[in-house]
From Swiss-Prot:
Subunit and interaction comment: Part of the 50S ribosomal subunit.
Source species of the chain: Trieres chinensis
Protein name per UniProt: Large ribosomal subunit protein uL2c
InterPro entries per UniProt: NA-bd_OB-fold (IPR012340), Rib_uL2_dom2 (IPR014722), Ribosomal_uL2 (IPR002171), Ribosomal_uL2_bac/org-type (IPR005880), Ribosomal_uL2_C (IPR022669), Ribosomal_uL2_CS (IPR022671), Ribosomal_uL2_dom3 (IPR014726), Ribosomal_uL2_RNA-bd_dom (IPR022666)
Renumbered residue ranges of the record's region Disordered: 219-255
Gene Ontology molecular functions: rRNA binding; structural constituent of ribosome; transferase activity
GO cellular component, one term: mitochondrial large ribosomal subunit
Amino acid sequence: MSIRLYKSYTPGTRNRALSSFTEITKTKPEKSLIQKNHRSKGRNNRGVITIRHRGGGHKRRYRIIDFGRKKHNVEGVVAAIEYDPNRNARIALLHYTDGEKRYILHPNNLNVGDRVVSGMEAELVIGNALPLEKIPLGASVHNIELIPNRGGQIVRAAGTSAKILAKEGDYVTLRLPSKEIRLIRKECFATIGEVSNNDAFLVQSGKAGRTRWLGKRPTVRGSVMNPCDHPHGGGEGRAPIGRTRPLTPWGKPALGIKTRKNKKASDAYILRRRS
């Protein structure tokens, strides 16, 4: 992927940097692999906002992606590389030899016409999926299962990959993109390679309207709200927050406070917390 930089022809193009989409080979999705996507816009069943800054945006159709890669020992050919509005990574359309079609996350350097397969004895080629115990040390993997046969759950974002550090007993040690070092069972499947679109973090919207197209609503500072809306609100003019420390809109300490539960079952498998 490459980034297209814009000149300051208008205020909306000043500082704009968007994807060039040069890797996209097909513009319309496969009809058999899409479904309606009802988005909650950050509201619960009573219409109350539970997640702020969500709403609006262009309608999206969900692409059904094969995170499990459980179609073992059946070869698939990459027919197209497509855009997915629901994620930063690109997706690849596979045509299997038995006639079935599926989407997978598109790894870097996987091109149209390449062949991929998943299974216990799959080759160590980009795009192939196999158990962690079959992958050598130092290899980069993505779309990793946390529990066998549940499907890939971690390392699925654009440009991410995990590195295999060690194997001991029933577990494999991986370094995740967050620098967390974690144990995962050796039977869990993972896909070889790095997720595509590793320049996604360089994208700059350039104008507020384009951010609204993506379904993101404005973030308002607490200091400009009323006291009834935020602990930092109120005062005459630009007043200080008037508290010993910054607080969230719900009155809990913010900035530097750990929010992870201290009695999670997965703590036993985390050798080093993320930095």
